[in-house]
Design a protein with these regions (language model features):
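Gly/Ser/Thr/Ala-enriched C-terminal appendages of enzymes
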Residues: 2-159
Length: 159
C-alpha cells in the first residue's frame, strides 16, 4: 500500500562467494525496516513457559543456541538494553529443502501446509498478534554476534 510501502518478504542478496567462502552483504535504506539482514543465518522461534512464541531470533549460521541457561540477545530497536531469554525453549525454523539442485525431502501438499499453519496459529502464536486491528508485534531479535556483524557492515560502508 502507498501508505505503508514496506514489504518484508522481498529476498535480496545476503552473501557473495569469494575465493571459496561467503562474504556477507547488506542493502541499506533510509527506512530501517528495509535494511537487509546480511549473511547466512539461522532463525529460531523462541517459546515461553506457556508454549507460545515470544520472539524469533536471528543468529549467524555457525552459532549454536543453548536455552539451558539464560540466553543474552539484542533487541535491534533497543540495543543498549541487556536482555535475556530465560526459561525458554527454541526451534529452528529453516529447513534444508534443496541441496545441489535436488530436493532433500518430498514436497508437502497444499493441505499439509494449510494444516501446519493452522496448528501453529492455534497453539504457538498469541491471539493478540493475529488480530487485524492493533495487533501486538512479533519480535525479531538477534544474537549479540550477529547484531555486531550487521552493525560493522553498516559502519564500514563507503560513500
Amino acid at each position: 500500500a502507498k501508505s505503508d510501502p514496506v514489504f518484508g518478504a522481498v529476498y535480496k542478496i545476503s552473501a557473495v562467494e569469494k575465493d571459496g567462502s561467503y562474504e556477507p552483504r547488506i542493502k541499506v535504506s533510509e527506512t530501517v525496516e528495509k535494511i537487509t539482514n546480511p549473511g547466512f543465518k539461522r532463525v529460531y522461534r523462541i517459546y515461553g513457559e506457556e508454549g507460545y512464541a515470544v520472539a524469533d531470533l536471528i543468529t549467524s549460521f555457525e552459532e549454536e543456541v543453548n536455552m539451558d541457561e539464560p540466553y543474552r540477545y539484542v533487541d535491534p530497536e533497543k540495543p543498549w538494553k541487556n536482555r535475556f531469554f530465560e526459561n525458554c525453549t527454541c526451534k529452528e525454523l529453516q529447513q534444508l529443502v534443496i541441496k545441489d539442485g535436488k530436493r532433500t525431502q518430498p514436497p508437502r501438499s497444499l493441505e499439509e501446509i494449510r494444516s501446519y499453519v493452522k496448528e501453529q496459529l492455534a497453539s504457538e502464536i498469541w491471539q493478540e498478534e493475529q488480530r487485524f486491528e492493533n495487533p501486538h508485534k512479533h519480535y525479531l531479535d538477534m544474537s549479540p554476534d550477529y547484531y555486531d556483524m550487521k552493525m560493522s557492515l553498516l559502519h564500514n560502508l563507503r560513500g
